[in-house]
């Protein structure tokens, strides 16, 4: 991305040609103007300008609500059809009858799938920061199921309380009855739904780049601007990061479906570039989304599941805890809380809800809970900052349009 006057001089593609104002004919002037505007927007955050940030956030929310209301009004027939369908489903939901057992099962599965799809979307979209929901939610869930499966020698956990709470069934399995495939099958639905959510979250960069290419209008999106600059200076790229991005871009552009599938299947931080590349070169939607969905929801998720399940299998966990105790000086003191945590988890798995035994909280679980709260809180702050900066961008664009007409 251009950050100084020299780079601004090099970027002359797509600059506006205004005949009535000489300053707008100069590409370096426009590039410097965009850089200043971007720096001004980036300064609009809650910890620097709280009042302005909150004001802009509220105004952006109102504008978005208005825009969505207009869109829904233009599609009012579809909205009415959806409302009628929801009304019929609501009647079926509340009427007593033999169908209620089926209704409750469908409701439970739909809510469970929607929960993990939503977390996957949050992890992928992120609105500037990203909420790492695999580390915070799906990973710990798979780890808990793995530990419980080896402790109970079964995955037939009572429902309820599963999945809200895991306890061993009354009839536990035989020793060695648990296999890797058994645990994979137990967590397959939530893992695939989370992967599908991450695939859906990759669509915004694709649609943004596709719209910019079709309209021919220069976008102020920073990632897309960086992508365009990378294409302009592809022959002179020297640093490793740029060469890696160019490799991804060439793979996606030349190989197509299989290239997108490979990028989506392997955990890497450059997949956003694949979405921008596909949008920029007008790759068909189903080619991009189909490859992304298969890669993220099936291939990549099985890789991540295998890693977590193997890492938290019984013998691996015991070996890791014993290795912690080998650390000189601080080993025993570090090992003790991990041993206490594992012992508490084992007791909890055999704890029945009506026994009334109080459960003491381990400092590891306490620290993890606080970490989750902090990350969710920071994610909410990032949403507020991002929407406030979006409104600031609207103000700057309006101001620029007024200046051009003078």
Curated annotation (Swiss-Prot):
Residue intervals on the Extracellular side: 64-76, 132-250, 295-306, 385-406
Membrane topology note: Multi-pass membrane protein
Places the protein is found: Endoplasmic reticulum-Golgi intermediate compartment membrane; Cell membrane; Vacuole membrane; Endoplasmic reticulum membrane
Record-annotated membrane-spanning stretches: 43-63, 77-97, 111-131, 251-271, 274-294, 307-327, 364-384
Segments on the Cytoplasmic side according to the record's topology features: 1-42, 98-110, 272-273, 328-363
Keywords tagged on the record: Cell membrane, Endoplasmic reticulum, Lipid transport, Membrane, Transmembrane, Transmembrane helix, Transport, Vacuole
Origin superkingdom: Eukaryota
Catalytic activity: a 1,2-diacyl-sn-glycero-3-phospho-L-serine(in) = a 1,2-diacyl-sn-glycero-3-phospho-L-serine(out); cholesterol(in) = cholesterol(out); a 1,2-diacyl-sn-glycero-3-phosphocholine(in) = a 1,2-diacyl-sn-glycero-3-phosphocholine(out); a 1,2-diacyl-sn-glycero-3-phosphoethanolamine(in) = a 1,2-diacyl-sn-glycero-3-phosphoethanolamine(out)
A GO term for molecular function: phospholipid scramblase activity
Protein name (database record): Vacuole membrane protein 1
Source organism phylogeny: Eukaryota, Metazoa, Chordata, Craniata, Vertebrata
């Amino acid at each position: 991305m251009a950050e100084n006057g020299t780079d601004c001089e090099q970027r002359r593609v797509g600059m506006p040609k205004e005949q009535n104002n000489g300053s707008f004919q100069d590409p370096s002037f426009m590039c410097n103007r965009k850089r200043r505007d971007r720096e001004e927007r980036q300064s609009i955050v809650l910890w620097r300008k709280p009042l302005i940030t909150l004001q802009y956030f509220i105004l952006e929310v109102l504008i978005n609500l208005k825009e969505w209301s207009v869109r829904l009004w233009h599609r009012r027939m579809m909205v009415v059809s959806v409302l009628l369908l929801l009304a019929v489903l609501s009647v079926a939901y509340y009427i007593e009858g033999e169908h209620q057992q089926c209704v409750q099962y469908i409701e439970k599965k739909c809510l469970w799938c929607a929960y993990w799809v939503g977390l996957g979307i949050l992890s992928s979209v992120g609105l500037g920061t990203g909420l790492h929901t695999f580390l915070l939610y799906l990973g710990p869930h798979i780890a808990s199921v793995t530990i419980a499966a080896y402790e109970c020698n079964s995955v037939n956990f009572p429902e309820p309380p599963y999945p809200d709470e895991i306890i061993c069934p009354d009839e536990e399995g035989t020793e060695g009855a648990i296999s890797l495939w058994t645990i994979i099958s137990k967590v397959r639905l939530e893992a695939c739904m989370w992967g599908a959510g991450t695939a859906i979250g990759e669509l915004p960069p694709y649609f943004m780049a596709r719209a910019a290419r079709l309209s021919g209008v220069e976008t102020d999106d920073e990632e897309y601007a960086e992508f365009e600059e990378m294409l302009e200076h592809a022959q002179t790229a020297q640093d490793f990061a740029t060469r890696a991005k160019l490799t991804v871009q060439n793979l996606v552009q030349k190989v197509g479906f299989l290239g997108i599938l490979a990028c989506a299947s392997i955990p890497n931080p450059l997949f956003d570039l694949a979405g921008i590349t596909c949008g920029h070169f007008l790759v068909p939607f189903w080619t991009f989304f189909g490859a992304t969905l298969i890669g993220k929801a099936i291939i990549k998720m099985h890789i991540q599941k295998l890693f977590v399940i193997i890492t938290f299998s019984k013998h691996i966990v015991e070996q890791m805890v014993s290795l912690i105790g080998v650390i000189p000086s601080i080993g025993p003191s570090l090992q003790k809380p991990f041993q206490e945590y594992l012992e508490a988890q084992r007791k909890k798995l055999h704890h029945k809800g009506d026994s009334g035994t109080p459960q003491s909280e381990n400092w590891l679980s306490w620290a993890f809970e606080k970490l989750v709260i902090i990350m969710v809180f920071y994610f909410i702050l990032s949403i507020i900052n991002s929407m406030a900066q979006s409104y600031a961008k609207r103000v700057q664009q309006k101001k620029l349009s007024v200046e051009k007409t003078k």
